Amino acid sequence: MKSLAGHVVKYGKHRERKSFARISEVLELPNLIEIQTDSYQWFLDEGLREMFEDILPIDDFNGNLSLEFVDYELKEPKYTVAEARAHDANYSAPLHVTLRLTNRETGEIKAQEVFFGDFPLMTEQGTFIINGAERVIVSQLVRSPGVYFHGKVDKNGKEGFGSTVIPNRGAWLEMETDAKDISYVRIDRTRKIPLTVLVRALGFGSDDTIFEIFGDSETLRNTVEKDLHKNASDSRTEEGLKDVYERLRPGEPKTADSSRNLLNARFFDPKRYDLANVGRYKVNKKLDLKTRLLNLTLAETLVDPETGEIIVEKGTVLTHQVMETLAPFIDNGLNSVTYYPSEDGVVTDPMTVQVIKVFSPKDPEREVNVIGNGYPESAVKTVRPADIIASMSYFLNLMEGIGNVDDIDHLGNRRIRSVGELLQNQFRIGLARMERVVRERMSIQDTETLTPQQLINIRPVVASIKEFFGSSQLSQFMDQTNPLGELTHKRRLSALGPGGLTRDRAGYEVRDVHYSHYGRMCPIETPEGPNIGLINSLSSYAKVNKFGFIETPYRRVDRETGRVTDQIDYLTADIEDHYIVAQANSPLNEDGTFAQDVVMARAQSENLEVSIDKVDYMDVSPKQVVAVATACIPFLENDDSNRALMGANMQRQAVPLINPQAPWVGTGMEYKSAHDSGAALLCKHDGVVEFVDASEIRVRRDNGALDKYAVTKFRRSNSGTSYNQRPIVHLGEKVEKGDTLADGPSMEQGEMALGQNVLVGFMTWEGYNYEDAIIMSRRLVKDDVYTSIHIEEYESEARDTKLGPEEITREIPNVGEDALKDLDEMGIIRIGAEVQDGDLLVGKVTPKGVTELSAEERLLHAIFGEKAREVRDTSLRVPHGGGGIVHDVKIFTREAGDELSPGVNMLVRVYIVQKRKIHEGDKMAGRHGNKGVVSRIMPEEDMPFLPDGTPIDIMLNPLGVPSRMNIGQVLELHLGMAARQLGIHVATPVFDGASDEDVWETVREAGMASDAKTILYDGRTGEPFDGRVSVGVMYMIKLAHMVDDKLHARSIGPYSLVTQQPLGGKAQFGGQRFGEMEVWALEAYGAAYTLQEILTYKSDDVVGRVKTYEAIVKGEPIPKPGVPESFRVLVKELQSLGLDMRVLDIKDSEIELRDMDDEDDDLITVDALTKFAEQQTAKELEKKAAEQVEDERQDIIQNFETAEDNLD
């Protein structure tokens, strides 16, 4: 194959990279969010209709009225996406359903369109807007319905088998053997009953029939012996039915009729039992005779029923070739046998199965019946007697060594429930609840005047949809830290959630990597911690088929010519098991044949060297194994998988920076991942850019129409980062459909740009980079290299209270004029104001309760309009660490037509923007799991510098590399340096990237030293360091764990109600817990006073802390502490147990523990002091007012006297 190392590849219109890939891409990556969009589209097109057709028609109890489904339609949405965001509304469209009500008595038919509630719509980005917030519905990975067989070992070490028929919804049917070789069944986890009892209940009551169907076997004989109703020829169906009923409903009177009804309802009623399409497909596939008979020896001659010709002789071994001949005959019902159940059985229809006799592998003399279920059509969604009999046959065959047990962790047995199906299931619940209401209304209301509208109550349907989007475990607030986080969230697969696993019950096997994950689920990207292995990510090329199984693409190998064709087949895991697949990097000749006679290939869980004539398929790309985030790690093949996992996860936490920079060393995935993430602004039609500015782009289509694109500016993302788009097209540029018009956050020239390319040296420096710490140059702070913008939202509601409405106002009690300087006349902060912690954002007062006014107060009120009623200041203030610049203010009122919650009259939202430079304590990381905390930011002049005088930007500890085995970072460092010297961007795709030779060759080309190291000089002394140092360009990202969000100090804050100790945590403005061990430390030091005040004043001595406050205010010595509140709580607890507890001092005299309410009246509390201050202020105001009144009175008297004098 021709060497492609170092060819130039174009990514989008604006970026070229030198790619080191040797394998040419045969298949484009699919649209990365199609798992969301396609599934939802299926729901709108087919899923909804399926639902209505399942539940309707609804007949009343007499069969007179019937409500039928005609059609449905989604009308225009009420709000656009942007309006829904702004109004805190849902982005949804009204669903209207046309229903027909038929009265069979009168023959009257009424058709009517009924409103079925607003249905949330998916945005183009694959998200939903619920209450103004973007949410993602995560796809769920669940066990597929079907029939499963497993081996089990009992406590004595005896091997046995078990089997389970799992429906999509309905009762489970389990089979198992015990130590005595007797087979039992359990229905829906109840007590076990002998297998033959269920067969009798189905209508095959006599022993002869049972042996005729299943053939003779030791297990069956033991089971019949155990069966209480054994009788060779008489049918014992009725006894079987009663037996089953007794096990299912112990204690109730057993009759054959009630048992018949119960079994019918459990298994054969489509409303209660549903295998779904996928369940029927899996059952037919598992019970398929073609796979079960493979490599067995026939015990009968098979004859074509139509012509009488012999197809296969008795004694023939059924190899692949023989089975190919036999397959069409089996499909056409070869050896079908019809059994007629007795009239008193559960089933009355005849049962047709296919029975083929083979010799037992364990005893070649004995014949064994292998029974197939006769392939029911996919429309049959319930389990049928033929399925039960065929699965029992499979179960009995397993003991003869025929058939295989299933691996439940294999992806052939696990399927994806995407948005569409999850919504459909939820909608079904709502419709089923509605159905009950409709039936009741049909029987109550007057049939003459009845219309479909009167029958339908949409409340249960609306509620179930609302519940799903609002509170389901799978409906998640979208991770919007950066576009990669957004994309990964939409491609996430969770094994948790309703109908899935729980964290506590999930063992190692479920979480582990399985060979069937290859090309379907990423083996690397999964969270660390309790969810490891339960939350996964879809591989880059994987798709989900109509049954919900994950498929991965392979190139077909033409067996005859040995050529690898460009024909792509998408295979599910269970189908892939039958083939041998070569790796994507197997060398090929010009004509597409393999260049070597032997290639590395996979056959199920084995990695083998296989001769090329046995190969069926070949991988399409080396990156089909991994997920998108993992495929963004260059030199992934040189990293340990644990570190790669951290690298993949940490890229999702990268904070968007002010000036994003795409990596010099990329993998070629940067463009595709940014393009499909939903953060970029994409062109919808071919055309020419006619107008472009920061807020709008207009494209004139080729057909003359004009498309307008709004560019989002500085919107708050779900994660509090800035969501900002920047146009990258220019006036007059020709654009095509799908081109990137504007970069989103963390994007540059259409590529994902999560961090910055910085000059990194691997060296220690005065111990400041001990334990993965990072030393950084002040240049990165000064030039805003790692500066990010954060927008926080604060809101204040004015509600109706019992004492009157709250008011948003500028007039706030006891607040000086300087605190109100940035508030407008309504009391709301102005846009652009710079605010600090504790500043007012929205002035608000709440009524305290109206007291009777005295005569003076009434006079005051009459003169000055002073507020007579007492109000409390409940203004919105900037919380600790929330200072910044007011970016936007939104006001919602009922008058303006905004929908507000009940009891809310006005809602004000204030957005504060912060510009955060990088800081000591911030967390940073590379792409290889090499994370650390910034420990010191040094002046540029003190940083070590290169021989040409360039100071380096970051120093990393070289000890972070060997034990962690993420060597990829060192290769990235060297290649990055070479790329920067050459002025080119490079791409090194995963598992097909630059080899060591490529790296060294590029290093030589760039004119660097052969070891890629350099001498560094100490910035303080100018002396060279002893050894040569690896210096290069590495891509480093700033993570969302910023010290500004974590730093916290308490001054005076809230106390817990019962123990009166300070609360904990930053959110509660709490204190630091001084625990048991910390107390020991102070005891060890003998720091008695410190210890005393920590256990009393600073904790829960309520009286003491108030007196201490008072003493500090008055400048007096601090008094002795009292009894801590937690001690009183203990005493009260013991008293509540009926123990007479008393507290004595050293002199044995009793200390009186008074309740807090009984404290001396002269005890001053903080509240009391505040109230005292308020009263003083009020008195001052009163005094001033009185003086003013007196002055005015004197003025009036003076004026009178003057007037009198003038008259005289």
Curated annotation (Swiss-Prot):
<dbReference type="InterPro" id="IPR037033">
    <property type="entry name" value="DNA-dir_RNAP_su2_hyb_sf"/>
</dbReference>
<dbReference type="InterPro" id="IPR007120">
    <property type="entry name" value="DNA-dir_RNAP_su2_dom"/>
</dbReference>
<comment type="function">
    <text>DNA-dependent RNA polymerase catalyzes the transcription of DNA into RNA using the four ribonucleoside triphosphates as substrates.</text>
</comment>
<keyword id="KW-0808">Transferase</keyword>
<dbReference type="Pfam" id="PF04563">
    <property type="entry name" value="RNA_pol_Rpb2_1"/>
</dbReference>
<dbReference type="InterPro" id="IPR007121">
    <property type="entry name" value="RNA_pol_bsu_CS"/>
</dbReference>
<dbReference type="InterPro" id="IPR007641">
    <property type="entry name" value="RNA_pol_Rpb2_7"/>
</dbReference>
<dbReference type="InterPro" id="IPR037034">
    <property type="entry name" value="RNA_pol_Rpb2_2_sf"/>
</dbReference>
<dbReference type="GO" id="GO:0006351">
    <property type="term" value="P:DNA-templated transcription"/>
</dbReference>
<dbReference type="Pfam" id="PF04565">
    <property type="entry name" value="RNA_pol_Rpb2_3"/>
</dbReference>
<dbReference type="InterPro" id="IPR014724">
    <property type="entry name" value="RNA_pol_RPB2_OB-fold"/>
</dbReference>
<dbReference type="InterPro" id="IPR015712">
    <property type="entry name" value="DNA-dir_RNA_pol_su2"/>
</dbReference>
<dbReference type="Pfam" id="PF04561">
    <property type="entry name" value="RNA_pol_Rpb2_2"/>
</dbReference>
<dbReference type="Pfam" id="PF10385">
    <property type="entry name" value="RNA_pol_Rpb2_45"/>
</dbReference>
<dbReference type="InterPro" id="IPR010243">
    <property type="entry name" value="RNA_pol_bsu_bac"/>
</dbReference>
<comment type="similarity">
    <text>Belongs to the RNA polymerase beta chain family.</text>
</comment>
<dbReference type="InterPro" id="IPR019462">
    <property type="entry name" value="DNA-dir_RNA_pol_bsu_external_1"/>
</dbReference>
<dbReference type="InterPro" id="IPR007644">
    <property type="entry name" value="RNA_pol_bsu_protrusion"/>
</dbReference>
<protein>
    <recommendedName>
        <fullName>DNA-directed RNA polymerase subunit beta</fullName>
        <ecNumber>2.7.7.6</ecNumber>
    </recommendedName>
</protein>
<dbReference type="GO" id="GO:0003677">
    <property type="term" value="F:DNA binding"/>
</dbReference>
<dbReference type="InterPro" id="IPR007642">
    <property type="entry name" value="RNA_pol_Rpb2_2"/>
</dbReference>
<dbReference type="GO" id="GO:0003899">
    <property type="term" value="F:DNA-directed RNA polymerase activity"/>
</dbReference>
<dbReference type="InterPro" id="IPR042107">
    <property type="entry name" value="DNA-dir_RNA_pol_bsu_ext_1_sf"/>
</dbReference>
<dbReference type="Pfam" id="PF04560">
    <property type="entry name" value="RNA_pol_Rpb2_7"/>
</dbReference>
<keyword id="KW-0240">DNA-directed RNA polymerase</keyword>
<dbReference type="GO" id="GO:0032549">
    <property type="term" value="F:ribonucleoside binding"/>
</dbReference>
<keyword id="KW-0548">Nucleotidyltransferase</keyword>
<comment type="subunit">
    <text>The RNAP catalytic core consists of 2 alpha, 1 beta, 1 beta' and 1 omega subunit. When a sigma factor is associated with the core the holoenzyme is formed, which can initiate transcription.</text>
</comment>
<dbReference type="InterPro" id="IPR007645">
    <property type="entry name" value="RNA_pol_Rpb2_3"/>
</dbReference>
<dbReference type="GO" id="GO:0000428">
    <property type="term" value="C:DNA-directed RNA polymerase complex"/>
</dbReference>
<dbReference type="Pfam" id="PF00562">
    <property type="entry name" value="RNA_pol_Rpb2_6"/>
</dbReference>
<keyword id="KW-0804">Transcription</keyword>
